[in-house]
Amino acid sequence: MVDTCFLSRGLTTLAGLLLLPFGSLAASQIEDQAEQFFRSGHTNNWAVLVCTSRFWFNYRHVANTLSVYRSVKRLGIPDSHIVLMLADDMACNPRNPKPATVYSHKNMELNVYGDDVEVDYRSYEVTVENFLRVLTGRIPSSTPRSKRLLSDDRSNILIYMTGHGGNGFLKFQDSEEITNIELADAFEQMWQKRRYNELLFIIDTCQGASMYERFYSPNIMALASSQVGEDSLSHQPDPAVGVHLMDRYTFYVLEFLEEINPASQTNMNDLFQVCPRSLCVSTPGHRTDLFQRDPKNVLITDFFGSVRKVEITTETISLQPDSGVVESSYKKDQMVEELMEPLKYAEQLPVAQIIHQKPKLKDWHPPGGFILGLWALIIMVFFKTYGIKHMKFIF
């Protein structure tokens, strides 16, 4: 009997030792999968959207920026991760036939200047200096959080710019310019300070491709609406407003983005094809040599949408609850109902009495010394002015 017991215990121990490596291997595989899942790419997305133009005839540039702003918000990037810079307020311009609105299509169905637009830099705050400070993080400590780009080395950043430009420069409010060298150096500072993981640069301006020619920092993908020597043309003229409502390149990019949802598998190669020369009239360009990943493996939502740490599975998972847990939960709910039963606040409050009760009459108090003195002064002035003989006309 004793030998049998020892034999059984020995077999159990041997089986445990044999299964231990398999259990450790399974646990190790699960840990590796979890680590790979949370280590993938980036953890947050940011957007810096800049309109550099002022004056009414540049209405389309404000509409461009606000339309991109609406698209990235729709795809999940919150306002806390968007820095919006508008050089002019077209919604409140005296020439606007529909005040407090900005439209990007001549059918006037969608107001892109809605109630939830949060402009971080407006009017004369939109300068080259402020733009570069936002990118590099070299801003005063008193600057509010909404005006900061609080990105890190796990951040994917979308930078969209629109306005008037030339070969190697972009104008800010017709008063200053940013060159492609200054922009390239700012991106290098961002990389050295670990302020981005990957960066997507989009510019809609004349000769836009010249702005990304000097880039040299890694993990940057750039798109432009026109090549060097070409103009970026406008779109959607509206007789009521008196100007064009959008630029061609941004119009077709946004038309493409309207078909995207947060779970979309559309990649960047599709974005490169949205505005051929037949539609844009100009020749859009892109640069991917600094980018480490193949554009066909880069999802649109990697830059335009929110980061969702969700993994879809087709496995069947049993959700049979423990009977003891169910019973305990039932008892807890029953106790809560018993506690809440007598607390019928609406019936306890004497609402009718409070609303309809008569106002309390104030007790009468004799006038103070100041009031009596004031009346005495009035009577003295009266007698001094009119005398006793006029009293008969009063009484």
From Swiss-Prot:
One of its GO terms (cellular component) is GPI-anchor transamidase complex. Disulfide bonds join 275-280. Pfam families: Peptidase_C13 (PF01650). Its main location: endoplasmic reticulum. It is found in: Endoplasmic reticulum membrane. The chain crosses the membrane at residues 369-385. Keywords: Calcium, Disulfide bond, Endoplasmic reticulum, GPI-anchor biosynthesis, Membrane, Metal-binding, Signal, Transferase, Transmembrane, Transmembrane helix. The disulfide bond between PIGK/GPI8 and PIGT is important for normal enzyme activity. It is a single-pass type I membrane protein. The active site is at residues 164, 206. Residues 28-368 are lumenal. A protein binds at residues 206, 232, 234. The keyword Endoplasmic reticulum applies. In the absence of proproteins substrates, exists in an inactive state with a disrupted catalytic site by an autoinhibitory loop. The binding of proprotein substrates, particularly the CSP region, to GPI-T triggers concerted conformational changes that alleviate the inhibition by the autoinhibitory loop. Meanwhile, proprotein residues near the omega- site induce the formation of a catalytic cleft for catalysis, following which the products are released and GPI-T reverts to the inactive state. Ca(2+) binds at residues 79, 82, 118, 120. Residues 231-236 are annotated as: Autoinhibitory loop. Heteropentamer. Part of the GPI-anchor transamidase complex, consisting of PIGK, PIGT, PIGS, PIGU and GAA1. Interacts with GPAA1. Interacts with PIGT; this interaction, via a disulfide link, stabilizes the expression of GAA1 and PIGK and links them to PIGS. PANTHER family: GPI-ANCHOR TRANSAMIDASE. Catalytic subunit of the glycosylphosphatidylinositol-anchor (GPI-anchor) transamidase (GPI-T) complex that catalyzes the formation of the linkage between a proprotein and a GPI-anchor and participates in GPI anchored protein biosynthesis. Recognizes diverse proproteins at a C-terminal signal peptide (CSP) region that lacks consensus sequence and replaces it with a GPI-anchor via a transamidation reaction. Transamidation catalysis reaction follows a two-phase mechanism. This is GPI-anchor transamidase. The gene is PIGK.
